[in-house]
Amino acid sequence: MNDLMKILGQTGQAATFDQIRIQIASPEQIRSWSYGEIKKPETINYRTFKPERDGLFCARIFGPIKDYECLCGKYKRMKFRGIICEKCGVEVTLAKVRRERMGHIELASPVAHIWFLKSLPSRIATMVEMTLKDLEKVLYFENYIVLDPYTTDLKRYQLLSEDDLYAKQDEFGEDGFKAGIGAEAVKSILAGIDLEAERAIMRADLKEATSEAKRKKLVKRLKLVEAFIESGTRPEWMIMDVVPVIPPELRPLVPLDGGRFATSDLNDLYRRVINRNNRLKRLIELRAPDIIVRNEKRMLQESVDALFDNGRRGRAITGTNKRPLKSLSDMLKGKQGRFRQNLLGKRVDYSGRSVIVVGPELKLHQCGLPKKMALELFKPFIYAKLEKYGLATTIKAAKRMVEKERPEVWDILEEVIREHPVLLNRAPTLHRLGIQAFEPILIEGKAIQLHPLVCTAFNADFDGDQMAVHVPLSIEAQLEARVLMMSTNNILNPANGKPIIVPSQDIVLGLYYLSLETPAFTGVEDKEAPLFGTMGEIEHALDSGYLKLHDKIRARVVRTHPDGSRTTEVVPTTPGRMMIGQLLPKHHDVPFALVNQLLTKKKVSDVIDAVYRHCGQKESVIFCDRLMGLGFRQAAKAGISFGKDDMVIPAEKYGLLEKTQAEVKEYEAQYHDGLITAGERYNKVIDAWSRCNDEVAAAMMREISRQDPGKPTNSVWMMSHSGARGSPTQMRQLAGMRGLMAKPSGEIIEQPILSNFKEGLTVAEYFNSTHGARKGLADTALKTANSGYLTRRLVDVAQDCIIVTADCGTERGLTMRAVMDGGEVVSSLSERILGRTAAEDVLDPADGSVIVKANELIGEIDSMHIEKLGVESVKIRSVLTCEAKVGVCAKCYGRDLARGTPVNIGEAVGVIAAQSIGEPGTQLTMRTFHIGGAAQRGAEQSSVEASHDGTVTIRNRNVVSNSAGAPIVMSRNCEIALNDASGRERARFRVPYGARLLVDEDQTVTRGQKLAEWDPYTLPIITERAGLVEYADLLEGVTLVERVDEVTGLTSKVVVDYKQSAKGADLRPRLILKDERGEVLRLANGAEARYFLSPDSILSVENGASVHAGDVLARIPREGSKTRDITGGLPRVAELFEARRPKDHAIIAETDGRVEFGKDYKAKRRIIVKNDETGEETEYLVPKGKHVSVQEGDYVHRGDPLVDGPRVPHDILRVLGVEALSEYLINEIQDVYRLQGVKINDKHIEVVVRQMLQKIEITEPGDTTYLVGELVDRIEFDEENERRLRAGERPAGGLPVLQGITKASLQTLSFISAASFQETTRVLTEAATAGKTDQLLGLKENVIVGRLIPAGTGSVMSRLRSIAAGRDRSTLAATRPALPARDEVSAD
C-alpha cells in the first residue's frame, strides 16, 4: 500500500483530522522538519539557471526541479524513483515535494522571536518580569543585564550601561558578578524559570495581594505560566537558535523575458539573514573585538525580525523600489493575506459573466443562457456525450467538432443542458438570495435573460448590470442546487418571512390599473350594476365595448369551502378584478375578496403571502408567473404616462407660505422682546417650516388623488400610490415645496426652499440645495464600505451559531409585548410571536383556557387569535435563553423564515442572521440621496394625542396647579394610559416632567384629542410650593453671568460652570424657597425646598421674587436638532452591536432609594441613593456640566436614570439583567431599521446578541483554577462547575459580560476563525503561547482547512462520519481485544 502511495506522490499523513493545535516550535522540532541546512545566500546560477548547492533553492535539500529527474541528469524516468544521485545528491522523486520540504538556518547567536517580543502584551517581557523598554535595551545590545549578582550589592536583572559595567567590574572584579547582553542573556533567564515552582509562588502571592494593580499584574503572569505548563512548551523556545526556511515553491523565483527575474520578497529577507549569520560566524572565529561582534549580533536580530514581521520594530526594510518588503506576517495579514485572499475567497472555474436583460416569457425557474456561453461552460459534458454516442472517436476529435460548431453539437448541448441547473450570482452578494439556481434555456444573442420577479432578491435592474453563471458539476452539487437554491424554492425572504418574489414597477402598475374602479360608478347602488354569470360573458361585453375594465358590475363567483364543496355567490366587483380573480388557486382560505380591492404593491404581496401559506409552493409559483404576465400585458395596454400638468401644485400653497412667514416674524419679535432665546427661536422656526411643508404636501396629495367623474386618474398618483415608482417625498419636491435643507455640517438652514421643481428654483435656492445633493452622493460612497464592514463583523461573530439539537429542554424564555411608540403600535404582538415557540401555555384572559400549549410553534392563525383575545404579553422561547452547549436548538429558534416550517437541524442560523441585518444596511446607505438631501425632520414632539377613543388613567400622578390654574406634571415617570370600553389598555404615553395636563383621571376622550402638551426645547425646573425665592451660591461673575444678546440687547441670567478657586470654597448654585418668616419650606416628601441648578440654566425668577406653585424657576435649553436619516442609522447600529459607551450617556440607579446630594468633588457632583429599608448607600459621581434629572429627596427605582442621555448597554445588563438588555438592544436596532421601513425579524438580532453574551467574568473562583476578573467562555464555565460539583468542591461564580461584535469575534474559541478576521499576528501569538486547540466546530475554520462545513448537508456528513468511526471502534474492540489501544485510534 505504501509503495502505491509513493507512486501517487502522496504523503502518508492522516487524511482526516478532527482538530488542529498550534504551539511554539522547539529548536529540535524545527530541525526535524528540515531536510538540510541552508548555508549560502545564493539562489540560482545566472548562467545555467540551476539552483546553487546549499543555497536558498538547493535541489539536494528541497528536491528535484523536474519530475523524476536528478539535477545532473544521470537518473531520469520513474524507474529510478527514490534513488539519491551520488553525483549531485538529489533524490529522484516528484518535483512537487519542493512545495512541502522545509530547510533551516543554524544561527550563530540566538535571536528573540519578534511576535513574542512586540505583540502586546509582550510574552517574553511578562515571563522575565521586565518592562518591554528595558527588555529591548538588552536584546538590541544597548544595556547589560545582571544575571547573578553573587555576593555583590547589585540587584538581579538590574540594567547596566557599558560604562557602569566597567566601573562595577573594576569595583567587584571580573568574576564578582555575572552579566550578559542580547538574546543569549534573556534565553538563560527564561531557561532558568521553574514553571511549576513559579505557579505555586504566584498562587500564594495572589491570595495575599491587596492592591488591584498588583493583582492584575500577578494574574497576567500566572495565566501565561499556566499556559506554558498546560501546553508543554518551554519559555526559552520564544528565543530562537534555528530559523525554519519555507519550501522554495512558496517563495518562487520566476524568469521574466529579457533575462530578468521576479522574486518573492521572502528570498531577499532570507538572504539578508544568511549573509549576516555567516558574517557573524566568521567574526566569532576570527575573535573580532567585542563591539564588532555585538553590532553584528544586533543586525542579525534585526534581519530575523524583518523576516518574521517587517516594520513591527523600527523602520521597515525596503527593496530596490523603496517599497517595504512583504514578510511572513504580511503573507497572512489583511485582505490580500493568505487567509482572506486564498483560503476564504477562492476563485471558481466553470463560470462566465454577461450583461442581463429582462426575460418576461421565462418561467420562474428558468433563465436564458446565450448559446455561446453554454457551449463553453458545458464543454466537458459535450465531449463525453459526443464520444458516448460514437459521433467522435477521441476527445481531440470532439474538441474539433465543438470548435467548428457542427449542428449535432447543438443537439447534444440541448440534451446536456436539460434539467442541469446553473447558478446565477450578482455582485455584491449581500445575502444568500444573491446566488440562485435556474434551469438554462438556450437563447440567441449574448446577454443572459433574467426573470423579472427575482430582481428584488438580486437587487438587479437592467441598466447594464452584469451577472456571473456557475455550473455545479457533481451530481451532489446539482442536487443541492435544485433542492435548496432553485429560485422557486426561495419565495420568502429569510430576513422577515415575507415573500420576496413580488411584482414591482410595471407589473404593479398594471395590476393597480386593472383593479381600479371608475369614479362615475362609485355612487351607483350595487343592486343596479349589471349582473354577469361567467367570465366568458364579461370578456364578450368587454370586447364589444359594452363594458370598460373599471366599470362596476355584479358577478357570480365560485367559493370553495373547507370541506371541499363549492357554492356561488354574487359580489359587486369590476371586470378587471374578475380577471385577476381568475388566476387565484381554488382554496377556501384564498377567497375572491383578497383581490376584490384596489391592489397596491403591499396588497399584492399579501395576496402572494396568503397563496403561499395556504396553497403551498407549487401553486404560488404558478400564480406569480401568471400574475406577472397579466400585469405586463395590462400595463402595456393601459399606456400610462404623465406630463407636466399631472403634477398639480395645490392652490392653498401660497396661503400656507404666507401664514408660516407671519409665524416666523412673530418668533423674531418674541426673540427681540427677550421672551425666547436664540436657540429656541431657531428651533421654533424650523418647526414651523416643517409643519408648513407637511401641510403643503398633504394639500398636494389631496389635489392629485382627487378623482373627478369622467376624468382619468392622475398618472403620477397612480404610480406613487400603487408603489410602482416614486414616493410621497419625491412628489412633494416636484409639486409641493422642496422644504428645509441641511448644511454640510448637518445643521438645518432655516430659510427653506419654497419653490418646487415644476416652478423651478431661484439661484439662491439652487445653491442651497447643492449641499444636500452632494452630501447624498458622498454618503453613498462612504457608507457602502461601512455597511460591508458591519456585515463582515456580524458574519464573523455569528458564523458558528448552528442549529444542533431539536430541543434543549429549557424552561426560560423572553416575554414579548407589542412595541409602542408615542401611543402608536409600531410592531404588534402577533408579528412578534409569529413563528416562535411558546415557553409556557398561552391562556385566554377571559376564561383561562389554553390557546397554545407550551413548546408548541405559534402559527399565523394562533398569533392572530392571541391578539384578538387581547392577551397582553406572551412568554416565548428565544435563542438568548437557549441552553444548548454549542449552537442553538430548533425549539428556541422557532420557524425557519425562508421556508415557513420549523427550522431544520444543521441550519446555519448565525450567517442568515448576519446577512439579514447587514443586507439592508448596504441598501439603505445607497438610498439616502434619492430625497436629494432634503432635511427630513418631523416637528419635535411637543404634545400627545389620543390614538384611540377611551377613558384616561394617569399613572404616577403628581400634579400641582400653576398661577394660571393649569395642572403641571411634577412626576418624572408619569404615564397616561387609554383604556377601551372593556377596560383593556389600548395605548400608553410617557408624559415628561413639566408638561401641562389637558385631561383628568377617568375622562372620556376621542381619537386625536390632545392629552398633554409641553415645550420640547427646554427642560423646566418647577416649584411645588408657593414662597419667596432666594439665590444661594449664585454669585455675580462667578457662578452667574448676565448674557447680553447682541441682536435684542436684552440680558438673561445664566448659570455658568465656574473654575474652582484655590481656597476650594465649594459653590453649589441653587434656589431656595422660604416662607414669609424666612424659614426654608419643606416639600411633600419632607425634604427642604432646594433646587440645584446645572450650568447653562437660564433663570426665570429674580432674587426675592414671590412664586406660585407650578411656576417655572429656571429653564435648561436642549440643543438644536440634526437631520435624521440612515446615515445616523448605520453608525448607530454599529455602535449598538459594538456595545460602545455612547458619549454623554445616562447614569442609572443600581438600587431603589432616595436621592441625596453629597459633598462635591473638584469637577464632579456626588449623588447618593440611599435605600430606606436596608440603609445601604450607592454613590455616583456626575460631571458638573451634566443636567441631573432628579432633585434631592426624589425616590428612584432600580434602572431609573439619574442623568439623562442614551443608556449604556453594559449598565442595563448589570442592573436589570439579560432580558432587559435584549429588549433594549432589539428595540434600539429595530428603531433604526423601522425608520427606513425595513422589516427584520427579532430573532436575527437575538442570535447576534447571544454571541455577544458568550463570556462570563469570574467574580468568585471557588475551588476552580479561575482567577477573579478572568473572562471565561460560558460553555467552559458550565462544564468546569459541573466537574467541581461532582467532586464535591465549590463551583465558581460569575456574571455575564456584554462584548462588542469585534471583540467577541476575536475571543471566539476557534483561533483559526479569529486569525482570519482581524489582528492575525496577535491572535496567532496568543494561541501559540497557550497551545490552543481548534475543534473545528464553526463554518469559517472548516472552510479554511478545506472541509465540508458542519451545516446543512455537511452537518449530516459529519454526523454520519462520527457515527461510523464510533461503530468501527467498537467493532475493532470486540474483534481484537488483545490489541494495544493505539491501533484503535488509527482505525479512524
Swiss-Prot record:
Class of the enzyme per the UniProt entry, highest EC level: transferase
Domain of life of the source: Bacteria
CDD domains: RNAP_beta'_C, RNAP_beta'_N
Keywords attached to this entry: DNA-directed RNA polymerase, Magnesium, Metal-binding, Nucleotidyltransferase, Transcription, Transferase, Zinc
Entry-linked SMART domains: RPOLA_N
GO cellular component: DNA-directed RNA polymerase complex
Binding site for Mg(2+): 461, 463, 465
Record's catalysed reaction(s): RNA(n) + a ribonucleoside 5'-triphosphate = RNA(n+1) + diphosphate
UniProt cofactor(s): Mg(2+); Zn(2+)
InterPro entries: DNA-dir_RpoC_beta_prime, DNA-dir_RpoC_beta_prime_bact, RNA_pol_asu, RNA_pol_N, RNA_pol_Rpb1_1, RNA_pol_Rpb1_3, RNA_pol_Rpb1_3_sf, RNA_pol_Rpb1_4
Cofactor note: Binds 1 Mg(2+) ion per subunit.
Pfam families: RNA_pol_Rpb1_1, RNA_pol_Rpb1_2, RNA_pol_Rpb1_3, RNA_pol_Rpb1_4, RNA_pol_Rpb1_5
GO biological process: DNA-templated transcription
Binding site for Zn(2+) 1: 70, 72, 85, 88
Residues at which Zn(2+) 2 binds: 808, 882, 889, 892
A single GO molecular function term of this UniProt record: DNA-directed RNA polymerase activity
Entry's EC annotation: 2.7.7.6
HAMAP family: RNApol_bact_RpoC
Function as written in the Swiss-Prot or TrEMBL entry: DNA-dependent RNA polymerase catalyzes the transcription of DNA into RNA using the four ribonucleoside triphosphates as substrates.
Family to which this protein belongs: Belongs to the RNA polymerase beta' chain family.
NCBIfam families membership: rpoC_TIGR
Subunit structure: The RNAP catalytic core consists of 2 alpha, 1 beta, 1 beta' and 1 omega subunit. When a sigma factor is associated with the core the holoenzyme is formed, which can initiate transcription.
Name of the protein: DNA-directed RNA polymerase subunit beta'
